[in-house]
């Protein structure tokens, strides 16, 4: 029997997950089908439950549904409990299990593929949604010295910082970037602005002083965030 999996989000057409999982399946000999699943912005739970009711085994969850994935799960891993967000849902026929692998993947990508040293680093995190929630704890465990979360809605950034109860995590508005951002910071975009080709209110000087700009989303072409970083003079950048 073919196991059914999918990646769910809005938008979702950009996702490379089906081709990536097809290669994994070919290597492991697993019989699986892996699709893209577009959920309405107000219909994540209904879409996810319909997928599982029709025989689906698991979902990878992307923007903007990671906090909703947390809320519908029956059982949550410690990483999900800490983040309040999930990027993976697994169904065994009775129980919906949630996990979050965003942070582990980010840390491995930054250190392994891009050679970034995280110990003692200052991280400027753009966005305070599910993607940001999932990576804060692994970054702290990797030894970063400070995480400044910047969000248009300041209360959300402050709530995220309060959730982790660690003095290294601070929350504020984008105006704090210009005031508090040191040189040699690691700039991480955890918003979906790049997918919508929207810019972010990041002062050019912040890009210029950063040592590395990383967009957690990706597309066929560099996102607006990466284009802005490069145009402002950021010395190195990549997407996830």
Label each region the model flagged.
Residues 68, 195-213, 224, 228:
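Rossmann-fold NAD(P) dinucleotide-binding segment
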């Amino acid at each position: 029997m073919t196991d059914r999996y999918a990646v769910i989000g809005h938008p979702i057409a950009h996702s490379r997950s089906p081709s990536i999982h097809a290669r994994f399946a070919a290597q492991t000999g697993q019989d699986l089908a892996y699709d893209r699943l577009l959920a309405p912005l107000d219909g994540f739970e209904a879409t996810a439950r319909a997928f599982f009711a029709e025989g689906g085994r698991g979902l990878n969850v992307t923007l903007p549904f990671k906090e909703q994935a947390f809320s519908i799960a029956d059982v949550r891993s410690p990483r999900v409990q800490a983040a309040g967000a999930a990027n993976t849902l697994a169904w065994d026929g009775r129980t919906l299990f949630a996990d979050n692998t965003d942070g582990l993947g980010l840390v491995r990508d930054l250190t392994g593929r891009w050679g970034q040293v995280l110990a003692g680093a200052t991280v400027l995190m753009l966005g305070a949604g599910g993607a940001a929630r999932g990576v804060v704890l692994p970054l702290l465990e990797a030894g970063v010295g400070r995480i400044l979360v910047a969000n248009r809605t300041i209360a959300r950034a402050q709530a995220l910082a309060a959730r982790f109860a660690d003095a290294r995590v601070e929350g504020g508005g984008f105006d704090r970037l210009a005031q508090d951002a040191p040189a040699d910071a690691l700039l991480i975009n955890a918003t979906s602005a790049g997918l919508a080709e929207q810019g972010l209110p990041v002062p050019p000087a912040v890009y210029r002083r950063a040592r590395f700009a990383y967009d957690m989303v990706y597309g066929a072409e560099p996102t607006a965030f990466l284009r802005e970083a490069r145009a402002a003079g950021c010395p190195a950048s990549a997407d996830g």
